[in-house]
Protein backbone atom coordinates (compact mmCIF):
# COMPACT_ATOMS: atom_id res chain seq x y z
CA UNK A 1 0.00 0.00 0.00
CA UNK A 2 2.84 2.35 0.94
CA UNK A 3 4.61 1.61 -2.35
CA UNK A 4 1.38 2.22 -4.28
CA UNK A 5 0.88 5.52 -2.50
CA UNK A 6 4.45 6.56 -3.26
CA UNK A 7 4.07 5.67 -6.94
CA UNK A 8 0.78 7.54 -7.09
CA UNK A 9 2.33 10.63 -5.52
CA UNK A 10 5.29 10.42 -7.88
CA UNK A 11 3.01 10.15 -10.90
CA UNK A 12 0.94 13.06 -9.66
CA UNK A 13 4.07 15.15 -9.14
CA UNK A 14 5.29 14.38 -12.66
CA UNK A 15 1.87 15.23 -14.06
CA UNK A 16 1.81 18.62 -12.39
CA UNK A 17 5.38 19.23 -13.50
CA UNK A 18 4.50 18.49 -17.11
CA UNK A 19 1.46 20.74 -16.87
CA UNK A 20 3.61 23.56 -15.47
CA UNK A 21 6.10 23.20 -18.33
CA UNK A 22 3.30 23.24 -20.89
CA UNK A 23 1.80 26.34 -19.25
CA UNK A 24 5.15 28.12 -19.69
CA UNK A 25 4.82 27.65 -23.44
CA UNK A 26 1.63 29.71 -23.56
CA UNK A 27 1.17 33.48 -23.31
CA UNK A 28 -0.85 35.31 -20.71
CA UNK A 29 -2.88 38.45 -21.25
CA UNK A 30 -3.93 40.33 -18.13
CA UNK A 31 -6.47 43.14 -18.37
CA UNK A 32 -5.08 46.55 -17.42
CA UNK A 33 -6.97 49.72 -16.56
CA UNK A 34 -4.87 52.46 -18.13
CA UNK A 35 -7.63 55.05 -18.33
CA UNK A 36 -6.34 57.19 -15.47
CA UNK A 37 -2.82 57.49 -16.89
CA UNK A 38 -4.09 58.11 -20.42
CA UNK A 39 -6.84 60.52 -19.43
CA UNK A 40 -4.47 62.70 -17.42
CA UNK A 41 -2.70 63.63 -20.64
CA UNK A 42 -5.90 63.80 -22.64
CA UNK A 43 -7.54 66.19 -20.17
CA UNK A 44 -4.55 68.53 -20.39
CA UNK A 45 -5.00 68.57 -24.17
CA UNK A 46 -8.73 69.27 -23.96
CA UNK A 47 -9.71 65.82 -25.24
CA UNK A 48 -12.62 63.72 -23.91
CA UNK A 49 -11.77 61.00 -21.41
CA UNK A 50 -11.54 57.37 -22.44
CA UNK A 51 -14.25 55.08 -21.11
CA UNK A 52 -14.09 51.28 -20.88
CA UNK A 53 -14.61 49.52 -24.19
CA UNK A 54 -17.49 47.04 -24.43
CA UNK A 55 -18.04 44.40 -27.11
CA UNK A 56 -15.98 41.67 -28.76
CA UNK A 57 -14.65 43.88 -31.55
CA UNK A 58 -13.47 46.59 -29.13
CA UNK A 59 -12.12 44.58 -26.18
CA UNK A 60 -8.76 42.82 -25.95
CA UNK A 61 -9.52 39.52 -24.20
CA UNK A 62 -7.74 38.34 -21.08
CA UNK A 63 -6.12 34.92 -21.38
CA UNK A 64 -4.29 32.26 -19.39
CA UNK A 65 -3.56 28.67 -20.40
CA UNK A 66 -5.38 27.32 -17.35
CA UNK A 67 -8.60 28.79 -18.72
CA UNK A 68 -7.87 28.12 -22.39
CA UNK A 69 -10.75 25.69 -22.88
CA UNK A 70 -13.15 28.52 -22.12
CA UNK A 71 -11.28 30.98 -24.33
CA UNK A 72 -10.16 29.35 -27.60
CA UNK A 73 -10.56 32.65 -29.45
CA UNK A 74 -8.21 34.44 -27.04
CA UNK A 75 -5.64 31.63 -27.30
CA UNK A 76 -5.60 31.90 -31.08
CA UNK A 77 -5.36 35.69 -30.95
CA UNK A 78 -2.44 35.88 -28.54
CA UNK A 79 -0.50 32.64 -29.03
CA UNK A 80 -0.83 32.21 -32.78
CA UNK A 81 -1.31 35.72 -34.15
CA UNK A 82 0.13 38.38 -31.83
CA UNK A 83 2.99 36.82 -29.85
CA UNK A 84 4.93 35.77 -32.97
CA UNK A 85 5.10 39.45 -33.95
CA UNK A 86 5.92 40.62 -30.43
CA UNK A 87 8.83 38.17 -30.49
CA UNK A 88 10.04 39.63 -33.76
CA UNK A 89 8.71 36.98 -36.11
CA UNK A 90 6.67 37.39 -39.24
CA UNK A 91 2.97 37.81 -39.62
CA UNK A 92 0.86 34.69 -39.21
CA UNK A 93 -0.37 33.36 -42.53
CA UNK A 94 -3.82 32.52 -41.23
CA UNK A 95 -5.11 35.49 -39.24
CA UNK A 96 -8.67 34.82 -38.12
CA UNK A 97 -9.20 36.62 -34.81
CA UNK A 98 -7.11 39.79 -34.94
CA UNK A 99 -8.89 40.99 -38.07
CA UNK A 100 -12.17 40.98 -36.16
CA UNK A 101 -10.94 43.78 -33.89
CA UNK A 102 -11.53 47.40 -34.84
CA UNK A 103 -9.71 50.56 -33.84
CA UNK A 104 -6.07 51.64 -33.56
CA UNK A 105 -3.41 50.29 -31.25
CA UNK A 106 -0.88 51.77 -28.89
CA UNK A 107 1.99 49.32 -28.36
CA UNK A 108 4.70 49.51 -25.69
CA UNK A 109 7.56 46.96 -25.60
CA UNK A 110 8.33 46.45 -21.91
CA UNK A 111 11.98 46.82 -20.88
CA UNK A 112 13.69 46.71 -17.49
CA UNK A 113 10.54 45.26 -15.95
CA UNK A 114 8.68 48.58 -16.34
CA UNK A 115 5.22 47.31 -17.17
CA UNK A 116 2.87 49.83 -15.55
CA UNK A 117 0.36 51.90 -17.51
CA UNK A 118 2.33 55.02 -16.62
CA UNK A 119 5.43 53.56 -18.28
CA UNK A 120 3.46 52.79 -21.43
CA UNK A 121 1.94 56.28 -21.56
CA UNK A 122 5.35 57.93 -21.24
CA UNK A 123 6.58 55.83 -24.14
CA UNK A 124 3.56 56.59 -26.31
CA UNK A 125 3.64 60.35 -25.78
CA UNK A 126 7.27 60.27 -26.93
CA UNK A 127 5.88 59.57 -30.39
CA UNK A 128 5.37 63.32 -30.78
CA UNK A 129 8.97 63.53 -32.00
CA UNK A 130 8.06 61.48 -35.06
CA UNK A 131 6.12 64.42 -36.51
CA UNK A 132 8.96 66.98 -36.26
CA UNK A 133 6.74 69.73 -34.81
CA UNK A 134 4.29 69.60 -37.71
CA UNK A 135 0.68 68.48 -37.74
CA UNK A 136 0.36 64.80 -38.76
CA UNK A 137 -0.21 64.50 -42.51
CA UNK A 138 -3.05 62.75 -44.29
CA UNK A 139 -2.98 59.07 -43.42
CA UNK A 140 -3.16 56.44 -46.14
CA UNK A 141 -1.84 53.23 -44.56
CA UNK A 142 0.90 52.04 -42.26
CA UNK A 143 4.15 53.75 -43.32
CA UNK A 144 2.23 55.72 -45.95
CA UNK A 145 3.38 58.37 -45.57
CA UNK A 146 6.54 57.04 -43.94
CA UNK A 147 5.99 59.01 -40.72
CA UNK A 148 3.24 56.59 -39.69
CA UNK A 149 5.45 54.03 -38.00
CA UNK A 150 4.51 52.19 -34.81
CA UNK A 151 5.60 55.08 -32.53
CA UNK A 152 3.55 57.62 -34.45
CA UNK A 153 0.49 55.39 -34.60
CA UNK A 154 0.69 54.73 -30.86
CA UNK A 155 0.83 58.49 -30.25
CA UNK A 156 -2.29 59.05 -32.34
CA UNK A 157 -4.07 56.21 -30.53
CA UNK A 158 -3.22 57.80 -27.17
CA UNK A 159 -4.58 61.17 -28.27
CA UNK A 160 -7.55 59.71 -30.15
CA UNK A 161 -9.71 62.80 -30.87
CA UNK A 162 -12.91 60.97 -31.77
CA UNK A 163 -16.20 61.53 -29.95
CA UNK A 164 -17.05 59.10 -27.12
CA UNK A 165 -13.66 57.34 -27.18
CA UNK A 166 -13.18 53.96 -25.51
CA UNK A 167 -10.11 51.88 -24.69
CA UNK A 168 -9.17 48.32 -23.78
CA UNK A 169 -5.70 47.35 -22.54
CA UNK A 170 -3.75 44.22 -21.62
CA UNK A 171 -0.32 43.28 -20.38
CA UNK A 172 0.73 40.55 -22.81
CA UNK A 173 3.49 38.14 -21.79
CA UNK A 174 4.83 35.96 -24.61
CA UNK A 175 7.09 32.99 -23.76
CA UNK A 176 10.48 33.25 -25.41
CA UNK A 177 10.37 30.45 -27.98
CA UNK A 178 12.07 29.66 -31.25
CA UNK A 179 11.04 27.92 -34.44
CA UNK A 180 8.97 24.85 -33.75
CA UNK A 181 8.27 26.01 -30.22
CA UNK A 182 11.84 25.45 -28.92
CA UNK A 183 12.52 27.64 -25.90
CA UNK A 184 15.34 30.07 -26.67
CA UNK A 185 15.56 31.50 -23.17
CA UNK A 186 13.73 31.46 -19.90
CA UNK A 187 11.15 34.12 -19.23
CA UNK A 188 8.88 36.16 -21.42
CA UNK A 189 8.85 39.13 -23.75
CA UNK A 190 6.20 41.53 -22.50
CA UNK A 191 4.17 44.34 -24.02
CA UNK A 192 1.40 46.70 -22.96
CA UNK A 193 -1.16 46.92 -25.76
CA UNK A 194 -4.19 49.21 -25.83
CA UNK A 195 -6.93 49.30 -28.44
CA UNK A 196 -8.70 52.65 -28.88
CA UNK A 197 -11.99 53.32 -30.65
CA UNK A 198 -13.43 54.82 -32.77
CA UNK A 199 -10.36 54.42 -34.98
CA UNK A 200 -8.55 57.79 -35.13
CA UNK A 201 -6.69 56.82 -38.29
CA UNK A 202 -8.71 56.61 -41.47
CA UNK A 203 -7.46 56.47 -45.04
CA UNK A 204 -7.28 59.84 -46.80
CA UNK A 205 -7.81 61.78 -43.55
CA UNK A 206 -5.70 63.68 -41.06
CA UNK A 207 -6.11 62.45 -37.47
CA UNK A 208 -6.16 65.96 -35.95
CA UNK A 209 -7.35 69.38 -37.02
CA UNK A 210 -5.22 72.47 -36.37
CA UNK A 211 -6.91 73.36 -33.08
CA UNK A 212 -6.65 69.83 -31.67
CA UNK A 213 -3.01 69.58 -32.65
CA UNK A 214 -2.10 72.93 -31.09
CA UNK A 215 -3.71 71.92 -27.78
CA UNK A 216 -1.85 68.61 -27.74
CA UNK A 217 1.53 70.19 -28.46
CA UNK A 218 0.95 73.02 -25.97
CA UNK A 219 -0.07 70.57 -23.23
CA UNK A 220 3.08 68.50 -23.72
CA UNK A 221 5.29 71.60 -23.76
CA UNK A 222 3.71 72.79 -20.52
CA UNK A 223 4.19 69.36 -18.98
CA UNK A 224 7.90 69.39 -19.82
CA UNK A 225 8.30 72.90 -18.39
CA UNK A 226 6.66 71.83 -15.13
CA UNK A 227 8.89 68.76 -14.91
CA UNK A 228 11.99 70.87 -15.44
CA UNK A 229 10.93 73.37 -12.76
CA UNK A 230 10.35 70.50 -10.38
CA UNK A 231 13.80 69.12 -11.04
CA UNK A 232 12.49 66.15 -13.00
CA UNK A 233 13.96 65.50 -16.43
CA UNK A 234 11.38 64.90 -19.16
CA UNK A 235 11.14 61.23 -20.01
CA UNK A 236 12.92 60.45 -23.27
CA UNK A 237 12.53 56.90 -24.64
CA UNK A 238 15.83 55.06 -24.62
CA UNK A 239 17.39 53.40 -27.64
CA UNK A 240 16.53 50.07 -26.02
CA UNK A 241 12.87 51.02 -25.82
CA UNK A 242 12.76 52.16 -29.41
CA UNK A 243 14.43 49.04 -30.76
CA UNK A 244 13.02 46.37 -28.46
CA UNK A 245 10.55 44.11 -30.23
CA UNK A 246 9.67 46.80 -32.76
CA UNK A 247 6.46 45.96 -34.57
CA UNK A 248 3.80 48.01 -36.23
CA UNK A 249 1.10 48.84 -33.72
CA UNK A 250 -1.40 49.55 -36.46
CA UNK A 251 -0.53 46.42 -38.42
CA UNK A 252 -0.20 43.97 -35.55
CA UNK A 253 -2.57 41.96 -37.68
Swiss-Prot record:
UniProt keyword terms in alphabetical order: Disulfide bond, Signal
The keyword Lyase is assigned to this record: no
One Pfam family linked to the record: Surface_antigen
UniProt signal peptide: 1-23
Propeptide stretch(es), residue numbers: 182-184
InterPro entries per UniProt: Surface_antigen
Subunit field text: The TA4 antigen is composed of a 17 kDa and a 8 kDa chain, linked by a disulfide bond.
Protein name: Sporulated oocyst TA4 antigen
